[in-house]
């Protein structure tokens, strides 16, 4: 059987534009340059990103890694044709995870899969990644943009990445040091962050590009549902690092998919439980809107969304005021939402 094609084939004819890839790299270089720090040993473009480890003063340096994406939040970015903040979400989801063990982010790498490489769009996305890196103190030392013609529609893309941080072994946050009477502090979120978008898409008709997405809502301070949902995930790294210098932090939870019920227990040891005062939680208006439009039960809301709390931190009762002062001085809306009690059956109770 003759498999030869009468027409000559090329990578471009197959849908992969190498020249566009080169242009995208050139356009993103200015964004990457913003993230350079003392650990960077080379420029973007090599086969591997080299980074010198800042281990001075550490007895047992430990590397901590985390990887994540933005979920289906990218669907809304695509619909709105707004791509300059979704990269912040990708970074936030990773660095907020590794700070939960006390690790200072060192560097970040991103991965973009797209149906068609449009250099200007890719540069916008990477610009957001760079902004997230600046906010967290991480260097953007590399990445990959993969063009997938035939696998993804031309306008679609997905974004993910991973972060690597460092912490001295003796300073790794150890939940086993937690005790009855410790206090749970909330750090306010900027909104839905990057989780629960599949439910949002159903409730608000995002996949059908519901016109109501673009109507200003009084309950959202005059903003539209679309722009409120696309608000970038808050990055807590620098605030938490400042806290760790002065306060005995015993546990941190990044409130992501699964909400309070799945994330708070991850930082609570056996035999103890975080008792959360629901009335103390400053629920953001967007969550009330999701609940009312979708008729979503309260339990499901707290089991899906952050509800206005992007991170919870456990500290000793006698250090609460110091912790709040430090966090507020670093721009956080921080407040007490609960305490640690003895309980052999549950690790979080909301009442």
Describe the residue ranges of each PLM region:
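Buried hydrophobic packing segments
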Residues: 24, 28, 50, 94-95, ...
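Short, acidic (Asp/Glu-rich) active-site segment that either coordinates a divalent metal cofactor
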Residues: 67, 158, 171-221, 225
């Amino acid at each position: 059987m003759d498999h030869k094609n009468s027409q000559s084939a090329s990578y471009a004819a197959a849908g992969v534009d190498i020249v566009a890839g080169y242009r995208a790299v050139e356009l993103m270089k200015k964004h990457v340059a913003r993230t350079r720090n003392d650990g960077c040993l080379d420029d973007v473009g090599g086969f591997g990103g080299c980074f010198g480890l800042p281990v001075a003063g550490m007895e047992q340096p430990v590397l901590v890694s985390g990887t994540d994406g933005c979920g289906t939040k990218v669907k809304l970015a695509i619909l709105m044709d707004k791509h300059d903040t979704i990269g912040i979400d990708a970074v936030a989801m990773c660095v907020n995870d590794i700070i939960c063990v006390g690790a200072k982010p060192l560097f970040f790498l991103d991965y973009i899969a797209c149906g068609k490489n449009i250099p200007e769009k890719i540069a916008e996305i990477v610009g957001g990644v760079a902004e997230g890196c600046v906010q967290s103190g991480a260097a953007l030392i590399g990445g990959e943009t993969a063009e997938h013609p035939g696998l993804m529609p031309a306008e679609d893309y997905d974004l993910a990445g991973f972060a690597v941080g460092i912490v001295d072994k003796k300073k790794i946050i150890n939940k086993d040091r937690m005790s009855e009477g410790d206090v749970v502090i909330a750090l306010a979120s900027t909104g839905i962050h990057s989780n629960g978008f599949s439910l949002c898409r159903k409730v608000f008709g995002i996949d059908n590009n519901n016109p109501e997405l673009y109507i200003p809502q009084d309950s959202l301070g005059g903003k539209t549902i679309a722009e409120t949902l696309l608000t970038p995930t808050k990055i807590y790294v620098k605030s938490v690092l400042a806290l760790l210098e002065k306060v005995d932090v015993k546990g941190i939870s990044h409130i992501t998919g699964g909400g309070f019920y799945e994330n708070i227990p991850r930082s609570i040891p056996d035999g103890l439980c975080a008792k959360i005062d629901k009335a103390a939680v400053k629920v953001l208006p967007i969550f009330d809107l999701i609940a009312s439009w979708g008729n979503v039960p309260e339990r499901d809301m707290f089991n899906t969304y952050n509800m206005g709390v992007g991170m919870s931190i456990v500290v000793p009762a006698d250090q609460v005021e110091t912790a709040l002062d430090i966090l507020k001085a670093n721009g956080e809306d921080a407040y007490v939402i609960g305490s640690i009690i003895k309980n052999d059956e549950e690790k979080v109770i909301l009442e």
